[in-house]
Amino acid sequence: VSGALYHRRLFQQDYVCMYRQHHPLMKAGMSSRDFLNVEHLIVSTQESPYDKINQSLEKAGIKANASFTVPHFSAVPYIVSTTNLVVIVPQKLALSAATPFRLAYSKPPIKLPTLQTNIFWHRRFAQDEGNQWLRGLLVECFADT
């Protein structure tokens, strides 16, 4: 980040393994072997930070068992709720999608990085009243501290 930009952390969250309720192969505390044997939905993006998740999955051997890929998270709950595919998503997405889509989620059996969400603004807007108001609103609505 250049010296011209300021930032503030809003929240951090873990990634979780999300799947449809009553998935025949998924259970809390699943083994790495079980996790590797299920078919995975991959969110195929080169944008940071999710590219680090795909790298972690590839190291664990998941790419070879990727049955389907999508370019964005928006379709993920619809796909996972009607298939036996498993996907790695940010925990807040899993939490909001679980009830309406009849999904379940659990901690994945492989180590994944934590996702940090920040807001950024250019220094020329640091004293702008509208920008300050918007930043304050974002912090009020989304910050975990």
Regions found by a protein language model. Give the residues of each.
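Hydrophobic hinge/microswitch elements
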Residues: Q46-A104
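Short beta-strand-centered segments that line the small-molecule binding cleft or hinge
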Residues: V1-Y15, Y19, A104-S106
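Active-site-adjacent beta-strand anchor residues
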Residues: M18, I42-V43, T69, V87, ...
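Secondary-structure junction motif
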Residues: G3, L25-K27, E39-A60, Q127-N131, ...
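A late-sequence structural motif
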Residues: R20-H22, M26-S32, L93, L103-T145
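Alpha-helical segments flanking ligand/cofactor-binding loops in enzyme cores
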Residues: R8, R33, P77-Y78
